[in-house]
């Protein structure tokens, strides 16, 4: 049975993850620190290099670089599934990202499209924050 609390939690969770990708459009990088938990438990895997497991500080730096390097950024979240376990939640979905990868030094750009999957783990402390991100490409 889904209670009203679970409905508002679900809405909050999807909004936080959408905010993560909206940063690619708005370039408001300060939001990255608002929606991700600055904690030693934070971790992430990316769909672009480097592929190793990253901590909070490294993740933020690479996310900032990624979002400022892609102009005309857009994304689509498909088939989201949210599972809530008390004060933690998992959001898994299919993800399409596209834009123009810009090389400011060479004044060139390359259109990119990344089809992939994403899993976000969030922790309610006291509001929902991202504690883990796993992005992976699907080679088509």
List the model feature ranges, each with a label.
Residues 1-35:
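Short, low-complexity N-terminal intrinsically disordered segments enriched in polar/charged residues
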Residues 51-53, 99-101, 138-140:
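A short local loop/turn or secondary-structure capping micro-motif enriched for an aromatic residue
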Residues 90, 110-140:
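Short beta-strand edge/turn micro-motifs at domain boundaries
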Residues 36, 94-97, 134:
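A mature extracytoplasmic/lumenal domain signature
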Residues 77-79, 92, 130:
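Hydrophobic residues on conserved beta-strands that form the core of alpha/beta folds
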Residues 68-69, 98-111:
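Short, cysteine-centered beta-strand-loop-beta hairpins and adjacent loop/turn segments enriched
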Residues 86-103:
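A short hydrophobic beta-strand element
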Residues 29-84:
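A solvent-exposed, acidic/Ser-Thr-rich amphipathic alpha-helical stretch
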């Amino acid at each position: 049975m889904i209670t009203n609390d679970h409905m508002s939690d679900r809405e909050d969770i999807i909004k936080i993850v959408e905010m993560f990708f909206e940063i690619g459009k708005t370039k408001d990088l300060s939001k990255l620190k608002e929606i991700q938990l600055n904690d030693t438990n934070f971790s992430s895997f990316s769909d672009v290099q480097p592929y190793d497991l990253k901590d909070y500080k490294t993740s933020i730096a690479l996310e900032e670089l990624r979002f400022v390097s892609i102009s005309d950024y857009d994304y689509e979240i498909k088939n989201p599934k949210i599972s809530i376990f008390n004060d933690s939640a998992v959001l898994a979905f299919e993800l399409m990202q596209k834009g123009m990868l810009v090389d400011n030094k060479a004044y060139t750009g390359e259109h990119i499209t990344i089809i992939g999957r994403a899993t976000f783990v969030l922790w309610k402390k006291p509001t929902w924050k991202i504690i883990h991100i796993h992005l992976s490409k699907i080679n088509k």
